[in-house]
Structure formats: C-alpha cells, structure tokens
Amino acid sequence: MVRDPKTEAALALHRFGLGPRLGSIAAIAADPRGALLSELDRPGIGRITDSDLLSSSQAARAAFDFRQERKAQRLADQELERQRQANASAPSTSSAAAMANAAPDGKDNTMDAKAASAAAQPQKPNVGPGIPQQIFLEEAKARINAALGADLGFVDRLVWFWSNHFCISADKGGGVRALAGAYERETIRPHVLGRFADMLLAVESHPAMLLYLDNARSIGPNSIAGINQHKGLNENLAREILELHTLGVRTVYTQEDVTNFAKVITGWTVVPFKQDAAHGGEFSFNPRLHEPGPQTVIGKPYPDLGLEQGRAVLADLACHPATAQHVAGKLARYFVADQPPQTLVERLTKSFLDTNGDLKELARALLTAPEAWTAARTKLKPPGEWIVAALRATGVTPPDIRPVIQAHNMLGAPLWRPPAPKGFSADSADWIDGLSERLDVANELARRVASLVDPQGVVDIALGPLATAETRQAIARAESRPQALALLLMASEFQRS
C-alpha cells in the first residue's frame, strides 16, 4: 500500500505515537518511520527527571507517617468520646447546676456553659488532606505532562505498554497508592529501551509489586519464621510472574512450578518502618523468611543461594521462548491490531530471542516491520491514549490534573488502578461500550477549550489527510464550536490507530 508522505506521517503519530500536535504531521512527513526510529536513540528519552517527585522510599515514608497520624487522630477521637460519655453519665446535680447557671437577669446560661466546656476540650490534631493522594496526583501530573510534551510519543507509548504489562494497583492499600508513580519511574522508564531481564528484575523486586501481590508477607513453611510463626506461603507473585509477566497463560509451567517458584522468592520483602526507620519501605531479602533448599522450576534445578536463587529463575524466564512469544503477541496487539498478522508476531518473537530481550531492538523491529504499517486502522484507542491525543490535538496542558484523572475514571481506565493483575485490556471490543462516556468527555473538553481553538484548524492538526470528506463536512456544519470539536474527537479517524 502506497501512501502520500503526510498520510504516512499522520498514521505514524496515531498508531505509534500519542497523536499529532501543532505542526507535527508536516515535521515528520519527509521520513515518518525514520523520525520514530530516531526517537529511540535520543539520550534520556522516556525518563521523568522532576526533582520535586519523591523516590519510592520517600513516598513510602510519607505514607507511613500519614497513617501513623491518622491512627493517632482516631485514638484521640476515641478518648474524647470516652470522656464525653463519662461526663454524660456522671451523677446529676441539676438544682445546683441550675442555680449556678442562673444569671442575674433570671436567664439560664447552661448553653453558654456547655459552649465554654466544649471550647476547653482538647482540639483534634490537624492531619490535613490525604498525603498518599497528594503524591499520586503529583505523579499523575508528571506523567501526563511528559506525554503532552513529547514530540512524537512512541517511547512514552512503550512506557505505558510495559507499565500495564507489569501493572500494580493504587487501590491495594498499604501505601501502594503513594508508590504508583515512583514504581513506573523507577522500574519501567529506566529500562524501557534496555533489556527485558533488567526490567523484570527491577519490577519484581520493587516494594510496590511486593506489596501489591502480597509477597512481602510470604513466608517459607520451613524457614525460621515459618516454623516459629506457623505462617505460610503466598503464591500470588510467583503465579503472575509466570502467567502474565513472562511465559503466558497455560504454557509450559505447572502448579508445582508456581509453588516451587513461590518458595524461591520467599524472603523478597519490604523493610517495615517500625523495625528499621532508616531503611523502611525499601526492598530487602530476609533470610529468616526464605524457604531453605533447592527448588525445581520449569524442569531446571536451582540451588539455594538465597537472593540469587530468585534472580537466577527470573533471568531464565526472561529469555525463555514462551516469554518471547507472549511479549511479541501483546506488543503487536497493543500497537497494530487486535488480531495482528502472524508474520508480525513471528518477526517480533525472533527479534526478542536473537537479541536476548533487547527492548530497543524489539521496538525497532516493530517500526521496521511492513505489517505494522499496512494493517488497516481498525483498532480503537484505549481511553488513556485517546484522552492524551485529544489534549495534544487541542494544545491544552491542564493546570489541574484532577479533571484528567476523572476522565480516566469515567472511561473505565482509572490511572494506575487496573481491575486485576492482568492490567487493562488492549482489545477494542472491551472499550466499545464506553463510547457514550467518551462523548461526555469530548463534550466537556470541547466546552472548556472551544474559545481557544479553531475546530477547522484542529482537524488539520489532528488528522490532516486522514480526515474524510464526511468528517470535514460534519465539522463545518456544526451548530457551535464546542459541537464541532466534539465531533472531531469522536470521529472514527481520530478514535482509531
């Protein structure tokens, strides 16, 4: 299929990037594929270097301190209530009290006395708004601003893909909400163009993942702690590593492999603040929790080398052929089609295996594959990608991130809050029922920005030659600017990649 340069450029930005911005279609029209490839070689691409953002250990400390303050608040409230009930049940001296409260003018001053007594009660400590949510919003703002500021957004799309592949949920509790943004910055962004094995190790040893999938509480049955405390194994993390992060569902592993692998990674935990204030919230290998002895996983024996036992299993999983095929299929479905060409999946699988999981080369293989460019534009953009594409097209950088978060919530894709460890779906069928909610979001965005932009101009910015005559005519005939913008954002050409 031969396309004119601007059509190819618009396709590149919608399929592989985060959507066009002002002038971006023309800027890459000479060589759209080359522009995307050059982004892979840009130093520091994909990283967020905002010095105001907290590290995961700092965020964990802030969340812990907040929980302690809330606990102190509850205890103080309970004590106040206990005192109130004690005072209420004290023997009444109504006559004396009435005489004491009688004013010279004969009026009863009981209410004034009660008010004075209430004012004398200890005041509740000023805990303030939720610290974990404040941290979450700052991280969300940094993520969205990075996406809006990206020239093309291909590497940011890769970050989003891997972040969803290795997802956690801010709804887990235990401080995970405060860690969600730092988790992505510390495990995904530094390795997005590195080696899959390095990303895998960073992810599985991060406190957010260990807390999300309960490995911080997993204890080897025959470990020192297991024998003393009679607590047991938690297989959640081991199962999701095999099923979702590496080999894929129903492939080469068995339930015995899950159990043995869970034993291997016992001791991979998070330092409690109450035990070690200086290192609380950090990853730690605790040998007291670790199941002793060798374990066999996917037919290979691993001697008990403590922490290195788990690292060795992860290293082998990272380069397993089933992992290569699983990752290749997901990447092709995310960027190209719900049912991608098998030749594309095979091409990506080969790249993964030939380069020992080099993710930059995997991304390069995707961009240079003919099938990735010739596939029809049938794939519905997931909510997050559509929201950012709409903001980029209109040139809006929201000063308040909360409406953007609310838009994600409305569309069923709350940021860093997937419904299950498998993450959000990339299949169009799973988002098609939410088009009425998209219309609500489109109308609201259009209402906010209509006075700032020309809808006809936005058509050229956002779609260029991809815009059909019917879409242009509908926008031209719209009754108002907001309606015209909403029609553009809901157009099939804009919705699909």
Name each model-derived stretch.
Residues V2-K6, A10-S24, D50, S57-Q58, ...:
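Flexible, low-complexity segments enriched for small/polar residues
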Residues T7-R15, I131-Q134, R157, H230-N236, ...:
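Short, compositionally biased low-complexity segments
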Residues L22-R189, A216, S223:
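N-terminal accessory alpha/beta regions
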Residues A29, L40, V203, L366-L367, ...:
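A general structural motif at alpha-helix termini
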